[in-house]
């Protein structure tokens, strides 16, 4: 597995190889780290790339543990970070 990829296991036990788009840390919700990713080769019904995000905790043995984003406020913060990055890339 490449360094900029992770494997996500969905609720049905299916594995999805995903490209890491970006990671960031935020103190607003208890000094959490977040990863925004996109399943490789998967698109929505309009043919657009799919994006998702999760919180994660770094650990030595496994490299990290993914955690669900717990609140609407937390999702809004992640969406704001994603939009800021997208705007910056669009401006380049």
Curated annotation (Swiss-Prot):
Recorded superkingdom: Bacteria
Pfam family, one: DUF1292
Family indicated by similarity: Belongs to the UPF0473 family.
Name of the protein in question: UPF0473 protein BA_4613/GBAA_4613/BAS4281
């Amino acid at each position: 597995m490449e360094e900029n990829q992770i494997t996500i296991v969905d609720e049905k036990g299916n594995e999805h190889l995903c490209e890491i788009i970006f990671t960031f840390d935020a103190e607003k919700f208890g000094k959490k780290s977040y990863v925004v990713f996109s399943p490789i080769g998967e698109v929505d019904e309009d043919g657009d790339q799919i994006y998702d995000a999760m919180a994660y905790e770094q650990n030595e043995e496994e490299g990290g543990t993914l955690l669900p984003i717990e609140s609407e406020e937390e999702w809004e913060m992640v969406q704001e970070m994603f939009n800021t990055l997208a705007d910056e890339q669009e401006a380049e």
